[in-house]
Swiss-Prot record:
Keywords: ATP synthesis, Cell inner membrane, Cell membrane, CF(0), Hydrogen ion transport, Ion transport, Membrane, Transmembrane, Transmembrane helix, Transport
Name of the protein: ATP synthase subunit a
Entry membrane topology: Multi-pass membrane protein
PROSITE patterns the record matches: ATPASE_A
Source species of the chain: Rickettsia prowazekii (strain Madrid E)
Amino acid sequence: MTHSPLIQFNIKKLIDIKMFGFDVSFTNSSIYMLLATTLSLTYLYLAFYNRKLIPSRLQVSAEIVYNLVADMLNQNIGIKGRKFIPLVFSLFIFILFCNLLGMTPYSFTATSHIIVTFTLALLIFLTVTIVGFIKHGVSFLTLFLPHGTPVWLAPLMIVIELFTYLARPVSLSLRLAANMMAGHVLLKVIASFTVSLMIYLKFLPIPLMVILIGFEIFIAILQAYIFTILSCMYLNDAINLH
């Protein structure tokens, strides 16, 4: 049981804290989320604090990420999406660092837990809903009735669209958590298998392990991108009501 690939996802209490009857203990998940936040802020500080005409590699990498997020908002929302750059950029950076931290040996992947990803998805869901009502008022409810829907079909379409809308934070959070968990389980299983193979094949399985780790890093970046691009699409529904 100690070799189970799922043991890496166990939540461990480090500081037991009770508040108003609720368990708000400081856990290994808390540490890695705090570490991801600290590393994100440090990275951005070092990249942008002393900007130069001829940028450093760190500055170039940060500008690439910033432009990526800005392009996502521009392509999905247009010029009106610029005001959401701080929110979406912070979201992307945080998820990216959480995902990448999980790739380090004996670490913990915070984004493999649904409570973490659902909280992030709920933040986007509430932002979209609030922005939609502020910008369009009651007209925002027309989002649940596609234009041109026949009157006799309207009640069914409203129910379907409302259910789809309410399911957004669930699907968004499950997608990220499931992909991160599946990837790490696969990596753990193949790593254990590779160690066994090394007894007979010496160092031959190592290149396979390197390729797999590289693929997992790609998946970590891709999942942060997918979460962010879907968030931009949801924001577009609130701003450019169709």
